[in-house]
Amino acid sequence: MDCAFIRCNLFLLKFKDIQPDRASRYMEETKEQILVQHLLQKKEAAWKELFGAYSGNLAYVCSRYVAEKEDAHDILQNSFIKMFRSIESFEYRGAGSLKAWMTRITVNEALKHIKQKGSFSSHIEINDLPDIPNEEEADFEEIPRENIMEMIRKLPEGYRTVFNLFVFEKKSHKEIAVLLGIAENSSASQFHRAKGLLIQKIKDFKTSKKAQYE
């Protein structure tokens, strides 16, 4: 499962688990509940607030799945349309549940976009790179987050899609296989190849940076 890699990746991408105190969580939940009520009433101001608060984060999600800005924009737009049309199905389950619901819709729209373009392939090119030993891990030390994300964006589409679902969406290879209509071992292979390509990109990046100071 390469759990060490996932832990390293999430930590060095500077994602932090911050536990708010009880009062802060209550205030956040209350604010979200009021917003949801207004969204259900289709109040324009509420939808503008929702877009302002979450569009940046969701645009970032879109850009992890597709390389072209125009495609990311289309996915984001379709995601908000889907949210507007399906808000009645949303069930509030506490702080963070609204964001989770929106992210889930955005990821689904990204996958839909990729499938419609017909650009996703489950084929594995064995000569893409040398085999990477299972124990070798990606060393993200001292690499800016945006550089890491750019490396992910430049992965072949199949590798990138599987990598995103496994690492960021925390899907199992069995779940990914169902989502993408591929074999479970194909998902695992594509993740392994994605990891290998990232390791090579990171090595090249560090070598390039080191050469600048010599």
Residue ranges and their predicted role:
Residues 40-49, 59-78, 184, 206-209, ...:
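Short, charged helix-capping/linker segments at alpha-helix termini
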Residues 112, 120-145:
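Internal acidic/polar
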Residues 60, 74-81, 96-108:
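Structural recognition of an alpha-helix C-terminal capping motif at a helix-to-coil junction
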